[in-house]
């Protein structure tokens, strides 16, 4: 196999969910050069996988808002040339959207993707040379691995392997990361529940760390810090630095957000609080200790999270 070009551009959780497929491909084709096309904001994540030889950042989100700028079209032209220079034997689009399928079409190599019945945007399947049927009721990780296996001629192993190497610890502190921010209000947990869980974690000797990604989340972090003894607000860090904080945590508790899946990838003890989405399709999966509480239209209390935490082997 000369080379394999993966297209999985976004979002953060989707990028993490693609990593086991990369591991599978490398295991079955160890001599192939693996290249990954990913949205520029998530390029640091793609580079974390040791089997990836090259990352090609794409900037579709930014380009759409700047189509009248000459520099945008120069960037698009340079991106197309970069795609062609990859010279992959197989091009695999696990994103399954029209925009990702158009990227596949611009690349050189045999283009693989989902068939019209297996894809969110059926028109996207028109752009592929080879179309594969993959059940839509499977978890995203399984769908990525299945499509990749069908494209490359193997059946994935039962075990999930994200392929990531844990970054070294810089100190011996024990802390729990609380991911309270998410993309929709319907997926948010009440602050009183975060406070209840945070106070219990403090009583167990864990420092509570509060990340944030926007002004609304920063203000919530301030309120939680004021109510949870010994807690601290995490500085806003680059994505690769945030990864180090997650990978070396003793525990992660979070609502349905992309960063949650990094904890699963690094096998950090994890409690996922789901409120408005189905964890069976996009919830955290991995080989570490994972507990999912709640579910679509199910609201778990902080006592339920404490009960789950008491059963987990917290990292030291």
Q: Which residue ranges define each predicted feature?
A:
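Catalytic machinery of carbohydrate-active enzymes
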Residues: 1-316
